[in-house]
Amino acid sequence: METGCWVLGGEFEDSVFEQKPERQPEPPSSYGAKLCEPQWFYEETESSNDIEVLTLKKFRGDLAYRRQEYEKALQEYSSISKQLPSTNFAMKRDVQEGQARCLAHLGRHEEALEIAVDLESKATNTEHLTSALSLHLAIFSRRQSLEKTILYLQKLISLHPLNPWSWCKLAEAYLSPGPDLPALGESPQGQKSSASSDKAVRASSVHSGTGCLPFPAPSPDSAVFSVEASGCDTQQDMQNCLAARRAAAQTEAQRKACAALIRARLLLQLAQSQQTSFALEKNLRTQQEIAQKVKEFSFREDTLLLMEEAMGEDIVPERIKEELHPEVQCVGPAALTASVAASSKEFEDKWFRKVRDHFSPLEKQSHVDIQIMA
């Protein structure tokens, strides 16, 4: 062959052109699916795997909790807790949360709170902390502690500021008449003051410690506003003072509730483009309910526009996507603690300052009017 000549196909091996025998497919191996009958976990098991046995017990506890058999569920969870190896952190957290929720339903709130505090202190990521804060919220809600309920809603919102449902719950809490304080006319010694005959004046209309009052809250030692020190000598003067303060407290609560609802609506509006079916239906229905509630507050249009601007400054579509598909962030305890509001004042200064500043001249005038009336 002359140098430089090229033969077509000469660069391939002969094996390339050989026809390989066809492989006959083997018959599929038999597969026996595990059939789980209803309440299959109540059957006796011969498994030697301790974790599998404990998992079955947890299922029994979960079913008992679902049936509201809290004593039975607590027994199951407690028996698991004693046998769990110290290295099985995931199941231990689940079991502890189950114990705490059962204790809360049984009225043993202090024991439930001890577990919740322990879970919060051991949280190593945002998912753990969210579960612990939600547990605190459930306990204080059952305990009917409005101040703490609002605080832990604020903590959850600090961790997940783009969750519209938490903002809706916060608005509802601001408008709830909480039983945190006894009757306003009751003295520290348990005796009724001269204003005790005014049964319409109840502490349930005052949200102590939650920032709902534009005036100093009463001290824990006394459920009576210091109206005597303000010059409210007569019973009529005292009733006028209390009525004015009650009205101011209700107005302040309505402002914050309205701002929270407006933010929830903004978040729902951005999320609706990514939702379908029942999720979208719930979204649109909630927006309608919010619109009706905001209308009932009867705030001026410029006030509502200011609230919408203030509560929507950080809302962008990219952040909404992150909230709908969150990533579990593993951070240190110090970083987790810094990510949530330490107090209601800190939270409300961050979120409601612009709204409060808008109304501050009116509040000052209202305060002066009360002092003159006193």
Swiss-Prot record:
Pfam families tied to this protein: DUF5588 (PF17826)
Composition bias type Polar residues, residue spans: 188-197
Region listing for Disordered, in residue ranges: 182-201
PANTHER family: ZINC FINGERS AND HOMEOBOXES PROTEIN 1, ISOFORM 2
Name of the protein described by the UniProt record: Uncharacterized protein C8orf76 homolog
Organism: Rattus norvegicus
